[in-house]
């Protein structure tokens, strides 16, 4: 099937020239071209038209999950009949394995997987392996991390067709090799069930199942079914059943891998003994021998990705396979917001390598663990082929790579102008901003406020909320699905003011925003550079009443450059509108199709007044009293001490003894249920923040606090 755009709009403004310029450069064999497009000029629509004209598979690379979700929704709407896929990290929380030598602290890997995103990742790999040419994958930098060999993924795909001669038993063996597991009760993604001559397979990358009906040793019928009701959706003549996971291998490769791991273990043990590291040698021997037994018996072990080099057949130092290897040779890469995405790609390898080196040095992992890693920047460049850099503020790197092939897209199809910029003093800036917010709330328009710190964003949210303003804040500590849902609620008018730090700068498409307020605009730095200010100001460029207010007591060089460039663009846009008799018109709000797939609620309650994420609980008549009554663990007893029988063993619930200290805190014991709930959430937030900052010891501490508080809540009962 060919790419075919479904849209009521046609390219206009600067778009036709930009589309032709990019297509011409790609057809002539240019390695790179830059699309310099202002906010609201329809860069995504331009990319879609380039894909349609060139008819080549495409990777759309974004620098964070929120923007990837937005792009995914837009491309799904442009190409409803083509394979538009979504590929981001499937971890809601991820703390990698680490060792801190200074405190002799080993931290095990801890994670939480989002099943919906896992499904979408498998769907992306399956679409690329299907042989289809009409595939677009919208991805974060997660596509640079190692996954299974695409040849193994393809070879373990189970091809079935009506009339095929195969026994039911043999088919079941193939399904197990493809990482499906058998079940009779819990029918879910990645499982199959057998009922007489019928085998139902719940696909790994879909919400549908395949029913295979046998007549003897022949497949008699195939159908796509609803896994819940069993109702037939479609009759099939053939269907490929792709593996239920990305990391698949063959028995032969597994046997060879075990042998190679044993050989490398011997070498590393000899090395440790030769330099007098007996403890490290003993530690490594125990770990690897245990893992080998697990692999032999079960086919896997915890942390098996650290042995991926052996299963893939790679040599030491050779890059891992990643999603990009699943693409055909002639795919095109679009790097959205390239001025941010490129530096992020550059930084990925360093942090991973540093952590792995410590684990290897102290005997927790074999040296091969270092080859389970993200790509280096040079490796990324070597496999991406022709690339289109997309940004309103491209950096020197993109301009140099493009060798002068820069396509400018300044004029918007809607005729909208870049918003004018006003500079106002910081004295009484919050009160002044509150007045501006109320003006826009009266006419059902939205406001974005950008601060320098997360704390200030939260304090502003509290300040405005107490004054009747419907507001929310959003920053890096907010979970992925919640960020998407907050943005959707903002678009839908459930609240009027969205406050954030740097997350608001990049590509958020919110046409109802008529005011962008930049606090402390004269504090020169990363968040107030010319690039950052230009990007932030652009958030008001999709509204006919757009205005940018910079609160500052002086005008910095970055502010001057931003104001000058804005005035230049406005002059060009005004002249274009005059010549073509265009009157600026408001952009329609679009809904993000990914929200429901991530588990968000597009029909959230139409809250009146301030919107808040907190929940209310009934205050209990007493507080549970944790006390150390059991050896090795504590019993959480219920009721006041005065009501307890002296020698009674309370068995309402147990937690680990090493978590008990948290619950012995008199402050915790005096809290209401709502306060304990909030404390648990705060511990979760701190855990994620510490893990993101590679402070693994702190992350583990906050995780234990969170676990203890959650256990405390589980046994909460009213007297």
Task: Name each model-derived stretch.
Residues 151-155, 451-477, 708, 712:
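Conserved helicase motor "Helicase C" RecA-like lobe of SF1/SF2 P-loop NTPases
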Residues 27-34, 56-57, 133-135, 445-446:
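Pre-Walker A (Motif I) flank of P-loop NTPase domains
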């Amino acid at each position: 099937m060919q790419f075919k755009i479904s849209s009521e709009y046609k390219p206009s403004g600067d778009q036709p020239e930009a589309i032709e310029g990019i297509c011409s450069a790609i057809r002539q064999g240019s390695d790179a071209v830059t699309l310099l497009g202002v906010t609201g000029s329809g860069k995504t629509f331009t990319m879609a038209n380039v894909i349609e004209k060139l008819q080549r598979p495409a990777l759309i690379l974004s620098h964070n999950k929120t923007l990837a979700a937005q792009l995914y929704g837009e491309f799904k709407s442009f190409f409803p009949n083509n394979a538009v896929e979504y590929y981001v990290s499937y971890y809601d929380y991820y703390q990698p394995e680490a060792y801190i030598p200074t405190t002799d602290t080993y931290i095990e890997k801890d994670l939480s997987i989002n099943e919906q995103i896992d499904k979408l990742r498998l769907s992306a790999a399956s679409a690329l392996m299907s042989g289809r040419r009409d595939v677009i994958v919208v991805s974060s930098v997660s596509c640079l991390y190692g996954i299974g060999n695409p040849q193994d993924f393809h070879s373990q795909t189970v091809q079935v067709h009506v009339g095929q001669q195969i026994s039911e038993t043999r088919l079941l063996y193939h399904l197990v090799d493809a990482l499906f597991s058998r079940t009779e009760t819990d029918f879910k993604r990645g499982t199959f069930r057998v009922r007489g001559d019928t085998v139902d397979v719940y696909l790994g990358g879909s919400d549908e199942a395949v029913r295979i009906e046998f007549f003897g040793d022949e497949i008699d019928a195939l159908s796509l079914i609803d896994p819940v009701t069993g109702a037939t959706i479609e009759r099939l003549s053939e269907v490929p059943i792709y593996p239920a996971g990305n990391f698949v291998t063959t028995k032969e490769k597994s046997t060879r891998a075990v042998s190679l791991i044993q050989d490398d273990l011997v070498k590393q043990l000899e090395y440790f003994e030769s330099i007098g590291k007996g403890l490290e040698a003993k530690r490594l021997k125990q770990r690897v021998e245990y893992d080998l037994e697990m692999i032999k018996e079960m086919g896997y072990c915890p942390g098996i990705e650290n042995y991926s080099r052996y299963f893939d057949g790679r040599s030491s130092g050779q890059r891992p396979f990643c999603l990009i290897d699943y693409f055909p040779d002639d795919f095109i890469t679009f790097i959205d917001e390239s001025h941010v995405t490129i530096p992020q790609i550059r930084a990925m390898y360093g942090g991973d390598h540093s952590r792995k080196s410590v684990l290897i040095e102290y005997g927790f992992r074999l040296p091969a663990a270092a080859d389970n890693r993200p790509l280096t920047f040079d490796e990324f460049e070597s496999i991406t082929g022709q690339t289109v850099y997309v940004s309103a503020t491209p950096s020197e790197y993109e301009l140099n790579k493009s060798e002068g092939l820069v396509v400018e897209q300044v004029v918007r199809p809607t005729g909208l102008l870049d918003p004018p910029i006003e500079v106002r003093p910081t004295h009484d800036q919050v009160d002044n901003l509150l007045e501006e917010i109320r003006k826009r709330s009266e006419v059902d328009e939205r406001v974005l406020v950008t601060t320098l710190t997360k704390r200030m964003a939260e304090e502003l949210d509290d300040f405005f909320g107490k004054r009747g303003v419907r507001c929310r804040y959003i920053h890096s500590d907010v979970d992925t699905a919640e960020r998407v849902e907050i943005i959707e609620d903002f678009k839908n008018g459930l609240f009027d003011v969205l406050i954030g730090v740097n997350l608001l700068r990049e590509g958020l498409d919110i046409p109802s925003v008529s005011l962008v307020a930049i606090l402390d605009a004269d504090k020169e730095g990363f968040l107030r550079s010319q690039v950052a200010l230009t990007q932030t100001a652009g958030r008001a460029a999709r509204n006919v009443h757009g205005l940018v207010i910079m609160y500052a007591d002086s005008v910095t060089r970055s502010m001057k450059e931003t104001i000058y460039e804005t005035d230049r663009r406005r002059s060009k846009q005004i002249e274009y509108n005059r010549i073509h008799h265009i009157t600026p018109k408001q952009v329609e709000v679009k809904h993000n199709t990914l929200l429901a797939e991530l588990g968000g609620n597009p029909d959230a309650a139409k809250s009146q007044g301030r919107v808040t994420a907190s929940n209310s609980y009934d205050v209990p008549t007493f507080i549970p009293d944790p006390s150390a009554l059991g050896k090795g663990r504590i019993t959480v007893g219920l009721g006041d001490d005065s009501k307890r029988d002296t020698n009674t063993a309370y068995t309402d619930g147990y937690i680990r003894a090493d978590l008990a200290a948290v619950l012995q805190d008199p402050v915790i014991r005096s809290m209401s249920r709502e306060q304990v709930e909030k404390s648990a959430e705060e511990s979760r937030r701190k855990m994620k923040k510490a893990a993101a900052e590679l402070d693994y010891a702190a992350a583990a501490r906050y995780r234990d606090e969170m676990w203890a508080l959650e256990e405390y809540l589980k046994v909460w009962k009213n007297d």
